[in-house]
Amino acid sequence: MSTKDPNRLPHEKGFHISWDQIHRDSRALAWRLDGLGPDDGHWRAVVAITRGGMAPAMIVARELDIRTVDTISVKSYHSGGGKADQRREAEVLKSPDADIMGDGTGILIVDDLVDSGKTLELVRTLYPKAHFATVYAKPQGEPQVDTFITGVSQDTWIFFPWDMALQYVEPYRGTD
């Protein structure tokens, strides 16, 4: 029986995603979405939630041959790193083209992850008929997403490749 360490930070339960993995999972998302669009199975456009949704949205758009791509920028975290990353109310910093969006019908909105669901909840109020897809989903945010590939526990911190830097690490033994 395991016990939780009260001194362990939540992000210490990590799930590291490589570029290869996000590519495979984003392609799997595209395959799952193929044929689900309201226009004979096709989608009118892909909208990426920046910044995390940009890479998955690019891959989904390529796989489904969707040429109309836009972004919506929503800020719901203070990104100071570590303990400074605290949730706050979500706010839209940049909206997609209104002529494309309408009420969201035929629009595929893509993000890398749904965590608390606050970001998707805000975007869903703006585009209630859009289809919301994420590569990864945590239980608290799952009600806000229509399609996702992999579920992860709420206390898991996902390390995406665009957030990681390669750096030298000392070997366990010796330095020569």
From Swiss-Prot:
GO terms for molecular function: guanine phosphoribosyltransferase activity; hypoxanthine phosphoribosyltransferase activity; magnesium ion binding; xanthine phosphoribosyltransferase activity. Its EC number is 2.4.2.-, 2.4.2.22. One of its GO terms (biological process) is purine ribonucleoside salvage. The gene is gpt. 5-phospho-alpha-D-ribose 1-diphosphate binds at residues 51-52, 88, 111-119. This is Xanthine-guanine phosphoribosyltransferase. Keywords: Cell inner membrane, Cell membrane, Glycosyltransferase, Magnesium, Membrane, Metal-binding, Purine salvage, Transferase. It holds the Pfam family Pribosyltran. One of its GO terms (cellular component) is plasma membrane. It is found in: Cell inner membrane. InterPro entries: PRibTrfase_dom, PRTase-like, Xanthine_Guanine_PRibTrfase. It catalyses: GMP + diphosphate = guanine + 5-phospho-alpha-D-ribose 1-diphosphate; XMP + diphosphate = xanthine + 5-phospho-alpha-D-ribose 1-diphosphate; IMP + diphosphate = hypoxanthine + 5-phospho-alpha-D-ribose 1-diphosphate. Its cofactor is Mg(2+). It is a peripheral membrane protein. Purine salvage pathway enzyme that catalyzes the transfer of the ribosyl-5-phosphate group from 5-phospho-alpha-D-ribose 1-diphosphate (PRPP) to the N9 position of the 6-oxopurines guanine and xanthine to form the corresponding ribonucleotides GMP (guanosine 5'-monophosphate) and XMP (xanthosine 5'-monophosphate), with the release of PPi. To a lesser extent, also acts on hypoxanthine. GMP binds at residues 88, 115-119, 157-158. It is an enzyme of class 2 (transferase). Homotetramer. Guanine binds at residues 115, 158. Pathway: Purine metabolism; GMP biosynthesis via salvage pathway; GMP from guanine: step 1/1; Purine metabolism; XMP biosynthesis via salvage pathway; XMP from xanthine: step 1/1. Mg(2+) binds at residue 112. Xanthine binds at residues 115, 158. Belongs to the purine/pyrimidine phosphoribosyltransferase family. XGPT subfamily.
